[in-house]
Amino acid sequence: MDKERLKYVLKEGEELPLPSMHPRALKLPLNSGKVLVLVGIRRSGKTFMLLDVMRQLLAQGVERGQIIQLSFEDDRLQPLRAGQLDLILHAQAELHPDLVGKPRYFLFDEVQNAPGWERFVRRLQDTRAGAVFLTGSSSRLLSREIATGLRGRCLSYEIFPLSFPEYLAFRGLRHEPYSTSSDAVMAAALDDYLQTGGMPEVVLAEEALRPRMLREYTDLVFYRDLLERHRLSNPEVLRELMRYCLAAPACLFNPHRLYLDLRSRGLAVGKDTLYRYLGHMEEAYLIFLLPVAERSARKRAMAPKKLHVVDWSLGYSYQPGPMIDRGRRLENAVFLHHRRQREDLGYVAGPAEIDLVVGLDGAEAWINTAWSLSDEDTWQRELRALQRPGGPTTRVLVARETAGRVAPQGTRIIEAWRYLAGEERA
């Protein structure tokens, strides 16, 4: 990294006007005394949240030269070697000698690309009054380096694509209580959400541009977060694995069947490689593998996982939207609704399957989802699952179309839009 070139990068960032921003539900503390770390899938809004932090700091009277904002994916910073991060401080001091001694605010994007970043950030926190905000797109990399270099010094936040309430806010929609017409607008908005997904830029883009944007997103994750970061040697297998996972939200995942399918098509791959690639996809926040709800860690590890994706719209990169079942999209959305809040989630396998169990060490709620309850077989199947003996007192059936069904005692039916909007809770 060259210091003179770095000055141009810093100055360019200072001169660019802040873009218009839609606020997210998460409000970051500006003066926590901790390093704030935002982790999540690419294009989920982490960078815009950093820019919103900058906007708030400027509104509080902080001078623009006190804010150092850099993306470590900027090719002008390459090659970046360990020990060169101090050049950032030197370059900023030379650009703004009048601000030396004032608090500095550091906003670093995709920080995992900077060798030795955790030691540098620790020193910033120890020696520079102000605050440090970081983003990254690898859960394992950040958690490992935070654990070794910044234990007890960080507040970490997972950033997901838009929730349904955030989607409504982005579109300028608001529910009016006790209004049947407003209820209908909310239900239609949910249909749109389950089609469009929650990637912020995609939601705001023209419909004709969305497929191309989604394909670019998946390509970016494929190359940068998977192939290049982990130096994977079998891109064909990785591409097929991504295609398979993104097209199968809310499905039981059978690695052995996929292994046989890939082998039958002439793609040589070992099972260990397949599991390793899956782990990398989880680290990149592309997928989530939901375990069976068992107290035994061994049973959880041995049983099949249920696959969920960070945003079902990414599956449209490989096939048209209608090919992905809308009921599975709804189930995936309900999973994400809870995953944003906690990690101890599971499912119950078997003929009377429970889609989502909240609380693995002691079930707090059973939640099933269905698109429509008008079909008698669907209605009876969901009831049998939720009314099985044992389990928690909270049992909820979330449906897009309730068809006027009345739940028996001990079970609640909640319209999907109300549930995902937070108007009714489990």
Question: Which residue ranges define each predicted feature?
Answer:
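Interdomain motor-coupling "hinge/lid" segment immediately C-terminal to the ATP-binding subdomain
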Residues: 2-5, 10-15, 139, 144-252
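Short glycine-rich substrate-engagement loop in P-loop NTPases that contacts/grips substrate
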Residues: 70-101
